[in-house]
């Protein structure tokens, strides 16, 4: 069984670019997206759609 560190689909946390709050947890495929993920999501603290980047 593979360990969590070398998992193909790890859990990642998405943080708002503007206020730096970590709002979302999702999974990504490391083979398809080796770079850091960036998505447009709703930030409840900013009360608007902002870019959310993957944090480590």
Swiss-Prot record:
An example Gene Ontology molecular-function term: structural constituent of ribosome
Record-stated family: Belongs to the bacterial ribosomal protein bL33 family.
The yes or no answer to whether the keyword Ribosomal protein is present is yes
Q: Which gene encodes it?
A: rpmG
Q: Which InterPro entries match?
A: Ribosomal_bL33, Ribosomal_bL33_CS, Ribosomal_bL33_sf, Ribosomal_zn-bd
What the entry lists under PANTHER family is as follows: 50S RIBOSOMAL PROTEIN L33, CHLOROPLASTIC (PTHR43168), LARGE RIBOSOMAL SUBUNIT PROTEIN BL33C (PTHR43168:SF2)
Any Pfam family hit: Ribosomal_L33
Whether Ribosomal protein counts among this entry's keywords is yes
Domain of life, per lineage: Bacteria
Q: Which HAMAP family match?
A: Ribosomal_bL33
Q: Name one GO cellular component term.
A: ribonucleoprotein complex
What keywords appear on the UniProt entry?
Ribonucleoprotein, Ribosomal protein
The name this protein carries in UniProt is: Large ribosomal subunit protein bL33
Q: Name one GO biological process term.
A: translation
Q: List, alphabetically, the NCBIfam families matched.
A: PRK00504.1 (NF001764), PRK00595.1 (NF001860), rpmG_bact (TIGR01023)
């Amino acid at each position: 069984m593979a360990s969590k560190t070398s998992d193909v689909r790890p859990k990642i946390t998405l943080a708002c670019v503007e206020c730096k709050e970590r709002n979302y947890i999702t999974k990504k495929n490391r083979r398809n997206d080796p770079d850091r993920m960036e998505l447009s999501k709703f930030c409840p603290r900013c009360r608007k759609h902002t870019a959310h980047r993957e944090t480590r």
